[in-house]
């Protein structure tokens, strides 16, 4: 279900390889990660998995469904001059697509009839854990200046709704994370919507909707012809039919080139390949920076420098400590994560849709405002848990089992100042994954590092306030052997890539698409995915990406009616 990209965080190789997650390929073909690679190891970079199934990364993400701050939508409205991108209208679109299962029906700002269900984790997995309650008691005091007396009060406060309507939605505080799961604890997303549309039948058994989905297909380029006044117009898509044809696919076989096919469009072509693959497809189609395209002997359809540039992401800096004793009542302690017949957690899920495998993201969310926030709102979104650890991606990350004494906070930086990332072609072969350079901290790096450091220090204050029997703590990350900022730089990661086909004023070549998702310089072509965000929205891109898809639906439907 995933493609395994390997990305570069830094141009400086010495700095890049200080990351304990840095991955190499050995001469026998196996992957190895760590700080002291064998002599025959080929450097690959940092693992960055992406969804490679119908529904994209929303089918394998942590299901976080938090909306971004209103200021992110208003920024797009101001940048493009299009008021329909204002936060009020984007909230209306969110209401249209949401089917909220955790708030009372009719709650303002929520929808209850949409195709994306929303829910939250089991609050008892917080309130029935004395050590977790103890830590959160200090977290509320140090973050919000709230004195909490007992587990019941912790539960009440944690169930405040970060997706509610209100001016203080992104004020510092603690919350449960909203998830795109339904009342049966099942993931929801575009996959389900597409599947329901595909299988719908009329009374005579014929397909109800004219939808065809071609799986096991790799888009290679958009096809163009001369349109009005000689302006290029997209009229179709060329693709390869076959299994595992992309080099980031674990099944990839270089000798298998697939079957070349094409499909034509009666109206328009829409590219929705995500922040890595959308710019690759556009460049292979002749839409991108002229010099790069010509270096690969690709005919230039339109010189559009914004394609593949301005790659952005949320930095994440992990905080991991180990307590002196295990954190009690860990619901995951009885899971063996094998997904086999002896996995009691899987048995519980299959029988009743309950238990730890019905949980998503992390049980704890914390908003924090640093001294360098560009607005009056929080600029960091932390999520965490006791008894488990998430510290980024490396071979085998999904089966890693942390000690029961572990506690992690993942510090997600919003309002990141770095727009220096790039997606560039390695060749004109559509099967070859592009070169991905994030160029961490290349722009406004000191500011972003300062913010992350303050959030790290805030979490340590919370731990230090939580005494015995959990204290003393052993700090695992950031590595205590180096300066805090150096430790953040060494182990920082990201997995919310955006902005490689960013939206902006129509016709401006510093931007890729206009406010109606139309690609600059051509007709009949739109992009609808996270690559269009002019800056990474909030701390988690899933909900805002669902919302822009609803926006595109309205825009395209209106254009057809007109």
Spans of model-derived segments:
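Structural core of flavin- and non-heme-iron oxidoreductases
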Residues: 1-6, 11, 45-48, 53-54, ...
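Conserved oxyanion/phosphate-binding beta-strand-loop segments in alpha/beta enzyme cores
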Residues: 41-43
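Core domains of carbohydrate- and sulfate-ester-processing enzymes
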Residues: 6-39
